[in-house]
Amino acid sequence: MKLHELKPAAGSRSERNRVGRGMSSGNGKTSGRGHKGQKARSGGGVRPGFEGGQNPLFRRLPKRGFNNPTRKEFAVINLDTLNRFEDGTEVTPELLIETRAVKGMKDGVKILSNGKIEKKLTVKAHKFSEAAKQAIEAAGGTVEVI
């Protein structure tokens, strides 16, 4: 067997079906679009969600909630992630980005208390959960809100 002798498996590849090329092709005349009507025309068809004039579902259901324009989105870091740093390290948002502990910085960093911290660190962040603050201080570290 040589490279130029390779052939695709039988039936795995088929020719493109060209419509509107004569009656004997099986797809001549109306080209698989049926007779007349909106969907038979060029550019024809209804928009997504259109239900034939009936009040559509998205209008029957009530609106809910609102989008807060001043919402802040924090990058979340858990305590067990902070164990990768050496004792006495000053952990800042810049250091977290540099070490790829945080993927994308948004409006700041928030430290949450998932996991245990075993190192004595100085942690600087924009927000802390109460439990995270207590855990860092219990491990001998310090907490600083930026």
From Swiss-Prot:
Tree of life domain: Bacteria
Which keywords fit this entry according to its UniProt record?
A: Ribonucleoprotein, Ribosomal protein, RNA-binding, rRNA-binding
Set out the biological process GO terms recorded for this chain's protein.
translation
Q: Which InterPro entries match?
A: Ribosomal_uL15 (IPR030878), Ribosomal_uL15/eL18 (IPR021131), Ribosomal_uL15/eL18_sf (IPR036227), Ribosomal_uL15_bac-type (IPR005749), Ribosomal_uL15_CS (IPR001196)
Gene Ontology molecular function: rRNA binding; structural constituent of ribosome
Where is there biased composition of kind Gly residues?
A: 42-52
Region ranges (Disordered): 1-67
| Composition bias type Basic and acidic residues, residue spans | 1-18
Report whether Ribonucleoprotein shows up as a keyword of the record. yes
Q: Which residues cross the membrane?
A: none
Q: Name one GO cellular component term.
A: cytosolic large ribosomal subunit
Q: Does the keyword Ribosomal protein apply?
A: yes
Q: What does this protein do?
A: Binds to the 23S rRNA.
Q: Which family does this protein fall into?
A: Belongs to the universal ribosomal protein uL15 family.
Q: How does it assemble?
A: Part of the 50S ribosomal subunit.
Q: Which PANTHER family match?
A: 50S RIBOSOMAL PROTEIN L15 (PTHR12934), LARGE RIBOSOMAL SUBUNIT PROTEIN UL15M (PTHR12934:SF11)
Put simply, this protein is called Large ribosomal subunit protein uL15
